[in-house]
Amino acid sequence: VEYFVSYYDYYQPEAYVPKTDTYIEKDSAINEQIDRMRNAATRNILEDNDVIIVASVSCIYGLGDVESYSQMTIPLKVGDEISPREVHRRLAELQYERNQQNFVRSTFRVQGDILDIFPAHYEDRAWRISFFGDEIESISEFDSLTGKKTADLKEVTVYPANHYVTPRPALSQAIVHIK
């Protein structure tokens, strides 16, 4: 069972009060736990897992194009030839933040040939990708708090850090049409 409900702890829409000529700016606060649950629900649907989604009215608002979102994933498999720098670049495109100090959801860190990724859909688990040159040598899952390895994996798919990512070609095309 997954949840796809409104992720706002607080939401103040923008408003204008003509009587006092006052503009009230939009303000909001996003609940990190609910955001993680929304990402987990999206991942489970796209991976065709048997899943029940409990949703609120917020699910009727568009998340964008499914094909575009799916294009933005990064499949990683043991034995794949891909440069670590390319993976770092792709993670940044997926709105993951490189952070060596504060390893939290939707971040990654690099130590030599080791890349740690804290997926947007996990609460307490992360992935360690070990490279030998430009080849993925191993992938493991570990507890993000203790660092203890919990599983050896053959492959993983990294999903975007949030639902509002756009592939570069679509972004370039939109810019041309706006001009």
Predicted features by range, described:
Residues 1-179:
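ASCE RecA-like P-loop NTPase motor cores
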